[in-house]
């Protein structure tokens, strides 16, 4: 019943962990900015609470961010910090005080994919995961993918094209891109 979200570390528009908007330099809602109140912005790990978070190409993720993700997985919460947060300030709304004091919930199932070598992923993060490895596609499988892609693209090609493309890659996506670029 939970949410399923997809995130790619190469996409910088959606923060994974979340952030705190500095009321002076980054701006905040008018009612918060005038009082100098920092505004926590929950990220995708909080949005995925109770559901699934899929991280595509986790191997491209900065190692520091991998460690932050590890902390979230361990605590099942995201903690927010800001030099502008003053727990004694009576003007801070209760919901913001609660986010700073208790954090935001982030209990989710993490599914991640990578084409990188397992050794390139944080060992601590890997130790908390069930790993599934897929064998590289065979040249015959690549050729079959090319024939299927050619049908979908309505491309007529010479009989040997699938075999030629299969000599250059073991990835289905790259193979279909080669076909699309050629035709």
Language model features: what each stretch is:
Residues 1-119, 130:
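Conserved ASCE/P-loop NTPase catalytic core
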Residues 158, 168-183:
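The conserved phosphate-sensing helix
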Residues 8-17, 119-152, 159-163:
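Conserved AAA+ ATPase core "coupling" helix
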Residues 83-85, 136-139, 176:
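Short, acidic/turn-prone active-site loops that include or flank metal/cofactor-
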Residues 63, 119, 139, 155, ...:
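Alpha-helix boundary/capping and short turn/kink residues
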